[in-house]
């Protein structure tokens, strides 16, 4: 199962020493990717050999202007194999779909072919919003829909009737939409995955097998997913 895991250390208070130690642990475990904040990318690049380096972009709010987001993606693409990019959440909630489309096509295009996972922040979305956003993610050329930053605000999510953590039901719904629309997208579930049992239930719910080009699990505790 570890070959499907994106090991993420993204808390804002983590030190360089802690993040580098995490990179060493990622290599030992043999996870799919190690995901860090952009400030640590050049340092972690020196450590990783087998494991792919992933950087988050505009994390966790998705609130920077498109030009800034694209410039950061272009710069990070010199160092990383993968990018987890937060969708422009405010624009999504404002139903400014043309602007959302323009942003994601521009930002994903700046990645130069790197694997891109667009974080849609499921806890904040209505059904109408999530399906419109999935369509735009597919059009943008991204490779994965990623469910959440793992930093969503519980109060707002509850107002919408949404869980803040990953569930098999949500994973199944994303995968079902992808299949129905014929999209060539993978699914990455992140947030609250703490046990091997949880992880297996989510993988089974997605139904894409155990292919890391189609399925990823984001967690800060990859050790518990060893099987």
Swiss-Prot record:
Pathway connected to this protein: Carbohydrate degradation; 2-deoxy-D-ribose 1-phosphate degradation; D-glyceraldehyde 3-phosphate and acetaldehyde from 2-deoxy-alpha-D-ribose 1-phosphate: step 2/2
Cellular component, GO annotation: cytoplasm
Active-site residue numbers: 84 (proton donor/acceptor), 146 (schiff-base intermediate with acetaldehyde), 188 (proton donor/acceptor)
SMART domains in UniProt: DeoC
E.C. code: 4.1.2.4
Cytoplasm keyword on record: yes
Subcellular location: Cytoplasm
Keywords: Cytoplasm, Lyase, Schiff base
Main location: cytoplasm
Catalytic activity: 2-deoxy-D-ribose 5-phosphate = D-glyceraldehyde 3-phosphate + acetaldehyde
Entry keyword Lyase: yes
Superkingdom in the source lineage: Archaea
Enzyme class: lyase
One GO BP: 2-deoxyribose 1-phosphate catabolic process
GO MF annotations in UniProt: deoxyribose-phosphate aldolase activity
Entry-linked PANTHER family: DEOXYRIBOSE-PHOSPHATE ALDOLASE
Protein family membership: Belongs to the DeoC/FbaB aldolase family. DeoC type 1 subfamily.
NCBIfam families recorded: deoC (TIGR00126)
Function: Catalyzes a reversible aldol reaction between acetaldehyde and D-glyceraldehyde 3-phosphate to generate 2-deoxy-D-ribose 5-phosphate.
Record's protein name: Deoxyribose-phosphate aldolase
Species the sequence originates in: Pyrobaculum islandicum (strain DSM 4184 / JCM 9189 / GEO3)
């Amino acid at each position: 199962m570890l070959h499907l895991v994106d090991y993420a250390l993204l808390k804002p208070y983590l030190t360089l020493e802690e993040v580098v130690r995490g990179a060493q642990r990622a290599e030992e475990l043999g996870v799919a990717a190690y995901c860090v904040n952009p400030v640590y990318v050049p340092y972690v690049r020196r450590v990783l050999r087998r494991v792919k380096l992933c950087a988050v972009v505009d994390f966790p709010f998705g609130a920077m202007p498109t030009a800034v987001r694209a410039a950061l993606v272009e710069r990070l693409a010199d160092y990383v194999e993968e990018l987890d990019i937060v969708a422009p959440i405010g624009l999504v909630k404002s139903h400014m779909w043309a602007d959302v489309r323009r942003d994601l096509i521009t930002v994903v295009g700046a990645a130069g072919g790197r694997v891109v996972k667009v974080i849609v922040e499921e806890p904040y979305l209505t059904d109408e919003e999530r399906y419109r956003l999935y369509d735009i993610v597919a059009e943008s050329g991204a490779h994965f829909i990623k469910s959440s930053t793992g930093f969503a605000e519980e109060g707002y999510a509850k107002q919408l009737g949404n869980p803040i953590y990953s569930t098999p039901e949500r994973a199944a719904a994303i995968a079902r939409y992808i299949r129905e629309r014929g999209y060539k997208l993978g699914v990455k579930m992140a947030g609250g995955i703490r046990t091997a049992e949880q992880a297996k239930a989510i993988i089974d719910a997605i139904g894409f097998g155990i292919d890391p080009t189609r399925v990823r699990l984001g967690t800060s505790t990859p050790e518990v997913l060893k099987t």
